[in-house]
């Protein structure tokens, strides 16, 4: 039985994720670069759906004065994060989902990486409204998600590219098919346009695309 919503148990997640998510390590690079330009000296940073703590570790290493709060609905993922950040100070952990966040005007930055595409539209709205509420005025929300293409034709092309990528990175034909079957059953990706629309409706004053490739995209939104 899996111990989280992703395709891999927490114990093997780090060793497998790059085989199914093209440019996975680029997500963190883009987030750190934007955060640095945004200015985060002595900031509070909430990472919801923190997983095994890959982003948080990079944040702690690059921005030593940042106070981190890491949340994840999977206790096993959170334990992996605790182990990875055992030597880092200024880090707190909570075993809750984005839908359960209860912060108000507390953080300068909120991130959610590969966390909300497991949710229905209503659940996604609640999760991202909670992220909005957690931010101080002028704070920034950065999220990376699996996405859907805007047309059936472009979706087919993107899926074909993704399949080729997985096969080239050691996944078997059966494993690749199983990953693709998760779309629409375990994963519920939405288009770039839908992402931007929801974030604006929640109340963010500035919403834009940060990065995109294959079937993944990053967005940033300012409160």
Please report, for each region that a protein language model flagged, where it lies by residue.
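Conserved class I S-adenosyl-L-methionine
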Residues: 1-40
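Core SAM-dependent methyltransferase catalytic element
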Residues: 205-223
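Conserved beta-strand signature within the Rossmann-like core of class I S-adenosyl-L-methionine
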Residues: 138-146
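Class I SAM-dependent methyltransferase SAM/SAH-binding core
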Residues: 46-48, 52-100
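A conserved beta-strand element that flanks and buttresses the S-adenosyl-L-methionine
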Residues: 111
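Short catalytic micro-motifs in class I SAM-dependent methyltransferases
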Residues: 114-117
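A short glycine-rich, Lys/Arg-flanked "PGG" loop and its adjoining helix->strand segment in the class I
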Residues: 125-137
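C-terminal alpha-helical "lid/dimerization" subdomain adjacent to the S-adenosyl-L-methionine
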Residues: 146-201
């Amino acid at each position: 039985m899996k111990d989280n919503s992703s395709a891999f148990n927490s114990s093997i997640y780090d060793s497998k994720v790059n085989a199914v998510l093209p440019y996975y390590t680029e997500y963190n690079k883009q987030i750190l670069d934007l955060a640095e330009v945004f200015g985060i000296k002595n900031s509070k940073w909430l990472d919801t759906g923190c997983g095994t703590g890959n982003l948080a570790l990079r944040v702690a290493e690059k921005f030593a004065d940042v106070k981190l709060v890491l949340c994840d609905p999977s206790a096993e993922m959170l334990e992996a994060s605790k182990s990875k950040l055992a030597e880092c100070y200024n880090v707190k952990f909570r075993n809750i989902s984005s839908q359960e966040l209860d912060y108000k005007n507390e953080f300068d930055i909120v991130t959610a990486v590969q966390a909300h595409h497991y949710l229905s539209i209503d659940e996604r709205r609640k999760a991202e409204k909670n992220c909005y509420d957690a931010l101080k005025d002028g704070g920034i929300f950065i999220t990376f998600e699996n996405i859907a293409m805007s047309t059936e034709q472009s979706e087919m092309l993107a899926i074909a590219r993704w399949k080729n990528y997985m096969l080239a990175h050691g996944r078997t034909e059966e494993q690749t098919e199983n990953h693709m079957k998760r779309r629409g059953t375990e994963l519920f990706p939405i288009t770039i346009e839908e992402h931007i629309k929801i974030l604006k409706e929640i109340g963010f004053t500035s919403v834009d695309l940060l990065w995109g490739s294959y079937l993944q995209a990053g967005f940033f939104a300012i409160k």
